[in-house]
Curated annotation (Swiss-Prot):
The gene is pgl-2. It comes from Caenorhabditis elegans. It is found in: Cytoplasmic granule. It comes from the Eukaryota. The keyword S-adenosyl-L-methionine does not apply. Highly expressed in the germline. Its main location: cytoplasm. GO terms for biological process: oogenesis. Disruption phenotype: Viable, and not temperature sensitive. Triple knockout with pgl-1 and pgl-3 results in 58% of progeny arresting as late embryos and 5% as larvae at 26 degrees Celsius. This is P granule abnormality protein 2. Transient component of P-granule which is involved in germline development. The keyword Amino-acid biosynthesis does not apply. The lineage of its organism: Eukaryota, Metazoa, Ecdysozoa, Nematoda, Chromadorea.
C-alpha cells in the first residue's frame, strides 16, 4: 500500500504532526486555557499543566477526531492512536471504517490488524530509505509501536525532537506518563524547547507551561471577566479590593505607587472597551485621599477631561471609530493653552501608559479578556493611542510643523494623519478665545495637509497655516515675563531680573511652594520654559 502523506504543520510556533487539532485549539483558546481551564478541553488543559487530573479517552478523541474531519485529519489522528499505545488501538481500527467511507485507508492497517511484526519492520525499512521528513515520522512511529518497555518507548519518542516536533514528544510523554526521576532532566529540556517555540505568540501558555498554575487571587478573577458587558458592581469590587490598604503602611511609598498604577490600569481597561460610564464610576469609587495621591495638584482638575480626550483616541486606534469626532470637550480645549495644564496632562498620560506594564498585577491578565485579538496587538495599539495623546499635547500649536510630524514614527498607518491634524484643529484650536497673547481661529480645510505626509515634510509650514496666530510667537524676553505674570522689567538687565525672581522664590517656605505649584513640582516652573 502506498504510504500516507505525513505533514508537519505550524500553528503560532507549535510544530506538530500527531496533534494538529490540539495545536489549533490552543491557538484560539489561549486565554481560556490559561485563566479558565475549568471551561477548556481537559486534554489541552492537562498538557499545559493547568489541571492535574489526566483526561479521559473520550476527551482526547474529541481533539484527535473533530467533527467533519477530512481524510488527512482522520489519518493523522490514527497515527496518534498508534503512538498512544494499546489502549487506543481499538479506536484506531474503528476510525479506519470512517476513513474507508471517504475512499481512503491507513497504510499500517493490515500490519496492525494482524500485528505482523515482519510486515511492520518491512514498512520501517522502506521508510528509512526515503529521505523525506514524513518517512522519518513513519520510522519513529513504527519504532514507538514496537517498543517493548516504557524506557524504550521514551527514547523513541525523544527522536521526534530531531524533527523539531518537541510539542508532539511532550504531549506523548505527558499522556503516557513516561516521566520519572531518571529522565526528568530530559523531559525538562523538551518542555523548555516548547516554551521557547510558543513564548513570542502565546506568552500566557508559555508562562503556564514553564511555571505551572498559580493561585488566582480575587483581583485576578475579577479582571478576567470581560468588562464590556459588566455592570458598575464589578468595577466597584475591583476598586474596593485594590483600595483596601489595610496591609499597606503609611510609609510604604513603593506599595502606594503600585496601588496607584493598578487603579490607573482599571481606568484604561474601561476606556478601551468603550465603557466611559464605568470609567466615571471607577473615579467616583476611588477614595479622595488616594485619588489626590494618584493625580496631585493641577492633574486632578483636568483629569476627567483628559480621560475623555484619551477615550476618543482609543476608539480610533482600536478601530471602533473611523474618525476623530469630538476629540476633546470645550473645557479641555480652553484649558490646554495653559502651559501648566499641558504639563499636568502629560503627567497623567505618562502615568496611564506606565500602568500598562505587565508587572502591575501579580498575574498576566489580558487587557480585553476573551478577545480574539492577541493581547500584544491590543497593548501596542493602546500604547500608541496614549503616545498620540502625549504628542498632541506636547506639540500643541505646532502639531502640523515638520519637526512635530517627524516625531510620529510609531503612528499607525491605518489612521490618516491628515484627519488627525484636522481633528486637533477642530477640537482644540477652533475655540474662539482671544487674550493678550493667544488668538485661536478656525482656518480653511485646504490649508491643512492634503493626505500626503511627504508633501507636508517638504513644506515649511507657518504658524498661520496651522491655525495659530502670530501672537503665539514670543518675540522677546519682556513678553515671556508678561505671560508668566511678572512685572515689566525691560529697563533692567536680564541678569538682575533673574536674580530678583530667584531670591524671592527662595524666601518662600516649602509648604507654600507645594500649595502654589501642586503636583507640578517645586523645581519645575523654570524647567518648563520650553513650553512657552
Amino acid at each position: 500500500m502506498k504510504p500516507c502523506k505525513r505533514e508537519i504543520v505550524d500553528f503560532d510556533g507549535i510544530r506538530t504532526h500527531f496533534f494538529p487539532n490540539l495545536a489549533l485549539y490552543t491557538c484560539y483558546n489561549e486565554e481560556l486555557i490559561a485563566h479558565h481551564s475549568e471551561n477548556a478541553n481537559r486534554f489541552t488543559s492537562y498538557v499545559f499543566g493547568a489541571v492535574e487530573d489526566s483526561p479521559t479517552e473520550q476527551e482526547i478523541l474529541e481533539i484527535l477526531f473533530p467533527e467533519n474531519a477530512n481524510p488527512e485529519a482522520i489519518s493523522t489522528g490514527m497515527d496518534a492512536c498508534l503512538a498512544l499505545g494499546e489502549n487506543f488501538l481499538s479506536h484506531y481500527k474503528s476510525f479506519n471504517a470512517r476513513l474507508n467511507r471517504q475512499n481512503h485507508s491507513h497504510d499500517l492497517l493490515d500490519a496492525v490488524q494482524e500485528f505482523d511484526e515482519k510486515k511492520i519492520l518491512a514498512i520501517s525499512r522502506k521508510s528509512r530509505l526515503r529521505k523525506s521528513a514524513d518517512s522519518k515520522i513513519l520510522t519513529i512511529l513504527v519504532n514507538i509501536l514496537l517498543s517493548e518497555n516504557q524506557e524504550e518507548k521514551f527514547m523513541e519518542i525523544c527522536e521526534l525532537c530531531s524533527l523539531d516536533l518537541d510539542f508532539d514528544a511532550f504531549v506523548l510523554i505527558k499522556i503516557l506518563q513516561l516521566e520519572n526521576e531518571e529522565n526528568a532532566e530530559e523531559v525538562q529540556i523538551i518542555r523548555e524547547n516548547v516554551v521557547d517555540q510558543i513564548l513570542e505568540q502565546k506568552p500566557f501558555l508559555a508562562h503556564l507551561l514553564k511555571n505551572g498554575p498559580e493561585k488566582i487571587d480575587e483581583i485576578t478573577k475579577l479582571l478576567s471577566v470581560p468588562i464590556i458587558g459588566s455592570s458598575s458592581n464589578q468595577i466597584n469590587q475591583l476598586i474596593t479590593k485594590i483600595c483596601d490598604s489595610s496591609e499597606i503602611s503609611d510609609t510604604a511609598v513603593e506599595e502606594h505607587y503600585h496601588q496607584n498604577f493598578k487603579l490607573m490600569n482599571i481606568l484604561v481597561r474601561t476606556m478601551i472597551v468603550d465603557r466611559f460610564d464605568l470609567t466615571i464610576d471607577a473615579l467616583e469609587q476611588i477614595p479622595v485621599e488616594i485619588k489626590n495621591r494618584m493625580f496631585p495638584g493641577i492633574r486632578i482638575r483636568v483629569l476627567q477631561d483628559t480621560l475623555h480626550f484619551l477615550h476618543q483616541l482609543f476608539k480610533v486606534f482600536l478601530n471602533e471609530s473611523q474618525k476623530f469626532d469630538n476629540l476633546a470637550p470645550q473645557s479641555f480645549a480652553k484649558a490646554i493653552k495653559n502651559v501648566w495644564v499641558r504639563h499636568a496632562i502629560i503627567g497623567i498620560l505618562d502615568s496611564l501608559k506606565f500602568s500598562l506594564n505587565k508587572d502591575v498585577f501579580n498575574q498576566l491578565v489580558p487587557l480585553i479578556p476573551g478577545s480574539q485579538v492577541s493581547n500584544d496587538v491590543i497593548s501596542g495599539k493602546v500604547e500608541n493611542a496614549i503616545s498620540c495623546a502625549i504628542w498632541i499635547v506636547k506639540t500643541f500649536g505646532t502639531e502640523g510643523s515638520r519637526d512635530s510630524i517627524e516625531k510620529l514614527p510609531w503612528f499607525d498607518s491605518s489612521v490618516e494623519l491628515t484627519e488627525l491634524i484636522n481633528s486637533i484643529e477642530i477640537a482644540v484650536t477652533s475655540v474662539e478665545v482671544e487674550d493678550q497673547t493667544v488668538n485661536f481661529r478656525k482656518i480653511p480645510q485646504k490649508d491643512w495637509l492634503d493626505g500626503n505626509l511627504q508633501k507636508a515634510l517638504k513644506t515649511e509650514p507657518t504658524s498661520e497655516k496651522f491655525g495659530i496666530s502670530n501672537s503665539l510667537k514670543i518675540k522677546d524676553e519682556n513678553q515671556r515675563n508678561q505671560i508668566r505674570g511678572f512685572k515689566d522689567n525691560s529697563k533692567e538687565p536680564n541678569a538682575k531680573v533673574s536674580a530678583r525672581f530667584g531670591s524671592k522664590f527662595q524666601r518662600v517656605d516649602s509648604s507654600t511652594k507645594r500649595r502654589l505649584f501642586g503636583g507640578v513640582g517645586v523645581g519645575e516652573p523654570r524647567n518648563c520654559r520650553g513650553f512657552l
